[in-house]
């Protein structure tokens, strides 16, 4: 989320008191930390990627296969942001405006899913198209929730910055008014 959360707590020790052997190298190193996956942002990104994948599979099996590109792209983008947030790439790559990219991704995904879901349900009669439309509506809700939360976090962050600027400007104004009264 924005501003970036501090480092998540490491996984707690097992009940036995000590860890059994060294960490397993390989693919497990690529998996996001459990603390991130249990956070609200992690859950939203998991839901976005899961619903996008299910919607993609439904569109592949349906007669509305013209719509399969949008869920595939959203699935890949959700996976990218999942791993980027989990690996804290937003801290490493400061040149990119991560909250704005995530916000725009969620807004466009919600709008596109809403439009293609309405079309899939209204225009096509097969069951896979109807299922894709229903999963698309669920994905619309998840993406809309995500962009609402991102917007609130960014607005809160900007409001904190504005209040600090106002305080500095107010102090400067008081100092200037004190010097004029002498």
Swiss-Prot record:
Q: Name one Pfam family in it.
A: MARVEL
Tissue distribution of the protein: Expressed in the leukocytes, placenta and testis.
BP GO terms, sorted: blastocyst hatching; chemotaxis; positive regulation of B cell receptor signaling pathway
Return the Acidic residues bias intervals. 1-12
Region (Disordered): which ranges? 1-21
Natural source organism: Homo sapiens
Residues annotated as signal peptide:
none
Q: Quote the protein name from its UniProt record.
A: CKLF-like MARVEL transmembrane domain-containing protein 3
Drop me one GO molecular function for this one.
cytokine activity
């Amino acid at each position: 989320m924005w501003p970036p959360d501090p480092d998540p707590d490491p996984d707690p020790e097992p009940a036995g008191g000590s860890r059994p052997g060294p960490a397993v190298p390989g693919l497990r190193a690529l998996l996001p930390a459990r603390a991130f996956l249990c956070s609200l942002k992690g859950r939203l990104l998991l839901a976005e990627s899961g619903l996008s994948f299910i919607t993609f599979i439904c569109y592949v099996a349906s007669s509305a296969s013209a719509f399969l590109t949008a869920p595939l792209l959203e699935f890949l983008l959700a996976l990218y942001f999942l791993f980027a947030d989990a690996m804290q790439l937003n801290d490493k790559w400061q040149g990119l405006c991560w909250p704005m990219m995530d916000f725009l991704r969620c807004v466009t995904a919600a709008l596109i899913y809403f439009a293609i879901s309405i079309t899939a349900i209204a225009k096509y009669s097969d069951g896979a198209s109807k299922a894709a439309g229903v999963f698309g509506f669920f994905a619309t809700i998840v993406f809309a929730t995500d962009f609402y939360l991102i917007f609130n976090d960014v607005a809160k962050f900007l409001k904190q910055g504005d209040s600090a600027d106002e305080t500095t400007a107010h102090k400067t104004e008081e100092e200037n008014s004190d010097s004029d009264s002498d």
